């Protein structure tokens, strides 16, 4: 998938789910399920409930996403 096809949204983690998944509420009030990107896992960046994050989504499935950045 090329980089141009990726949609980016900001949101807040509202719930931690099993298997390193998170329930995220986006700025446009949609709720999605997201997992951490490999680079965040590699650098051991922790994501907790209440954290403000950036999520990448594909236009083909708007219910799942990948957490790419945690705001400080």
UniProtKB/Swiss-Prot annotation:
It comes from the Bacteria. It holds the Pfam family eIF-1a. The keyword rRNA-binding applies. It comes from Bartonella bacilliformis (strain ATCC 35685 / KC583 / Herrer 020/F12,63). Component of the 30S ribosomal translation pre-initiation complex which assembles on the 30S ribosome in the order IF-2 and IF-3, IF-1 and N-formylmethionyl-tRNA(fMet); mRNA recruitment can occur at any time during PIC assembly. The lineage of its organism: Bacteria, Pseudomonadati, Pseudomonadota, Alphaproteobacteria, Hyphomicrobiales. One of the essential components for the initiation of protein synthesis. Stabilizes the binding of IF-2 and IF-3 on the 30S subunit to which N-formylmethionyl-tRNA(fMet) subsequently binds. Helps modulate mRNA selection, yielding the 30S pre-initiation complex (PIC). Upon addition of the 50S ribosomal subunit IF-1, IF-2 and IF-3 are released leaving the mature 70S translation initiation complex. Coiled coil: none annotated. GO terms for cellular component: cytosol. Gene3D superfamilies: Nucleic acid-binding proteins. It is found in: Cytoplasm. One of its GO terms (molecular function) is ribosome binding. PANTHER family: TRANSLATION INITIATION FACTOR IF-1, CHLOROPLASTIC. Belongs to the IF-1 family. Signal peptide: none annotated. This is Translation initiation factor IF-1.
